[in-house]
Amino acid sequence: MAETYDFLFKFLVIGSAGTGKSCLLHQFIENKFKQDSNHTIGVEFGSRVVNVGGKTVKLQIWDTAGQERFRSVTRSYYRGAAGALLVYDITSRETYNSLAAWLTDARTLASPNIVVILCGNKKDLDPEREVTFLEASRFAQENELMFLETSALTGENVEEAFLKCARTILNKIDSGELDPERMGSGIQYGDISLRQLRQPRSAQAVAPQPCGC
């Protein structure tokens, strides 16, 4: 049976290699931790239908390789993305220091209006932390990002990260800030929304005419 949904959003998962991007995606799609995860080569893909704010939304999620040698390949997948998880490892300052470059890529190659949530992953390794919550919060605030610390291992805040991003996109559609019909918006109407959009015209076409007698 074909899936029905109100909207389809294209999402990216971006950040340096070894931050747990593939594990976050796997936890969100399969609701379990991905054992023996290797570095992504190129891109990986997953999708899931979720309910957000009374709407049914299909998330198409592209997990991009973090290694520099794959950047030219993965950048082509940025186009037309509506949302992104920008991931660093709380136990690796090096991955945190590279966030600005990843964010620049997202806003340049996808869209200046892309909705981004910063994810400090591997929260379960808090004793090995190199990046404080306060420091990352400040970076998020300065760059107008949402922010959560996540654990792909335990699942903590993984679902919330994706849903929070989707909820923000829906709010921007409702406010008129984002237009699903604009080319490259990363948003498509699903069957449900298309039927609702067409309904007024159909109803208008068959509306009874007033009697002239």
UniProtKB/Swiss-Prot annotation:
Family membership noted in the UniProt record: Belongs to the small GTPase superfamily. Rab family.
Chain location of the short sequence motif Switch 2 per the record: 65-74
Main localization category: membrane
Annotated GO biological process: D-glucose import; early endosome to Golgi transport; endosomal vesicle fusion; protein transport; Rab protein signal transduction; regulation of endocytosis; vesicle-mediated transport
Subunit structure: Interacts (GTP-bound form) with RUFY1; the interaction allows endosomal tethering and fusion.
Catalytic activity: GTP + H2O = GDP + phosphate + H(+)
InterPro entries assigned to the protein according to its UniProt record, in alphabetical order: P-loop_NTPase, Rab4, Rab_GTPases_membrane_traffic, Small_GTP-bd, Small_GTPase
Cofactor: Mg(2+)
Span of the annotated motif Switch 1: 39-44
Keyword terms: Acetylation, Cell membrane, Endosome, GTP-binding, Hydrolase, Lipoprotein, Magnesium, Membrane, Metal-binding, Methylation, Nucleotide-binding, Phosphoprotein, Prenylation, Protein transport, Transport
Annotated GDP binding sites: 18-23, 121-122, 124, 152-153
Lineage: Eukaryota, Metazoa, Chordata, Craniata, Vertebrata
Cellular location(s): Cell membrane; Early endosome membrane
GO cellular component: cytosol; early endosome membrane; insulin-responsive compartment; perinuclear region of cytoplasm; plasma membrane; recycling endosome; synaptic vesicle membrane
EC number(s) on file: 3.6.5.2
Function: The small GTPases Rab are key regulators of intracellular membrane trafficking, from the formation of transport vesicles to their fusion with membranes. Rabs cycle between an inactive GDP-bound form and an active GTP-bound form that is able to recruit to membranes different set of downstream effectors directly responsible for vesicle formation, movement, tethering and fusion. RAB4B mediates endosomal tethering and fusion through the interaction with RUFY1 and RAB14. Acts as a regulator of platelet alpha-granule release during activation and aggregation of platelets.
UniProt protein name: Ras-related protein Rab-4B
Organism whose genome encodes this protein: Rattus norvegicus (Rat)
UniProt enzyme class: hydrolase
Domain notes: Switch 1, switch 2 and the interswitch regions are characteristic of Rab GTPases and mediate the interactions with Rab downstream effectors. The switch regions undergo conformational changes upon nucleotide binding which drives interaction with specific sets of effector proteins, with most effectors only binding to GTP-bound Rab.
Mode of membrane association: Lipid-anchor
Modification N-acetylalanine occurs at: 2
Single GO MF annotation: G protein activity
Keyword Nucleus: no
Residues that bear Phosphoserine: 185, 193
PTMs per UniProt: Serotonylation of Gln-67 by TGM2 during activation and aggregation of platelets leads to constitutive activation of GTPase activity.
The keyword Transit peptide is assigned to this record: no
